[in-house]
């Protein structure tokens, strides 16, 4: 019963569209502001210095490529699996730094106004995203094809979800910015 519900075209379309929007909205600012993203990568201190710049150059293109792969029905299951793997890697990178006590750094997920400090909550978020992506990779080959109504509802719901997440992230960033400026004033 639950598997049939999860394999509903409107559900798979929603998850697919959400991952497309998430990956594209994460990749584009990294491409536009490469030096800033390079600084974020270096700040994680998980790789040798000489590898940080190539990684910072390749990662946004990988995110964008996976987003494009999710658009195409023939490559969507593979792209969903790759998205899940990427979320696991991001979660591990965040978890390592949280365990080190390095929570004051930006996760690099999005850009400036949406800076998010590292936390176990972000690790959990990435675990949930990985689970959704791996589930999508598993369900897409057996899910019925989406019709126009499924596509419209799935993409609209994904777009609204992204807007809500962006809004919450912006408000959180404004709150933490206000708190840090109050602390610096004494």
Curated annotation (Swiss-Prot):
Keyword ATP-binding attributed: no
Q: So where does this one cross the membrane?
A: 2-22, 54-74, 76-96, 129-149, 151-171
Write down the membrane topology: Multi-pass membrane protein
Which InterPro entries does the entry link to?
Methylamine_util_MauE
Q: In which pathway does it act?
A: One-carbon metabolism; methylamine degradation
- Give yes or no: UniProt keyword Methyltransferase: no
Query: What's the main place this protein lives?
Result: membrane
Q: Name one GO cellular component term.
A: plasma membrane
The superkingdom listed in its UniProt entry is Bacteria
* Keywords, alphabetical: Cell membrane, Membrane, Transmembrane, Transmembrane helix
Biological process GO annotation list? methylamine metabolic process
Q: Where in the cell is it found?
A: Cell membrane
What does this protein do, in the record's words? May be specifically involved in the processing, transport, and/or maturation of the MADH beta-subunit.
What name goes with this protein?
Methylamine utilization protein MauE
Gene name of this polypeptide: mauE
